[in-house]
């Protein structure tokens, strides 16, 4: 028995009608297919349904780190009424962007871990989506000598990689016996 909540057979007609209207209104020369997903990296991302775009205007949806692709994905999830906890079950892709981006994030996470281990200085990634942050956290979970956490709010959330045992930026440093003057952190002015 499958524990799939969504399938292409169930939601494809609604996705098809919605995306056809949007792409036609925008004048995009795009085609797409809705299919049950087969994830090459289920430990990082395991969607149940994937929408793959192709056509002459496919590069437009991939500009600016796939901003339009992600916006179409988000609007489609809203149209379907998917709760936030189900957002990883639907994935939009074009030209294998998601797979390439996942590999890029995994390699960046490994490089950041090496840098933090050698310098003992935290490394902060640029802001990224919750899916991308999850991929970085999962890539770092088995790296020794480092830990990661997300900081920031909204579209400014980012992953910070810390040396193991180092305090988080949001955590106060331990105080010495006589109070703040013995803190191991510098005061910001």
Predicted features, each with a name:
Residues 1-189:
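RNA-contacting regions in translation and RNA-metabolism proteins
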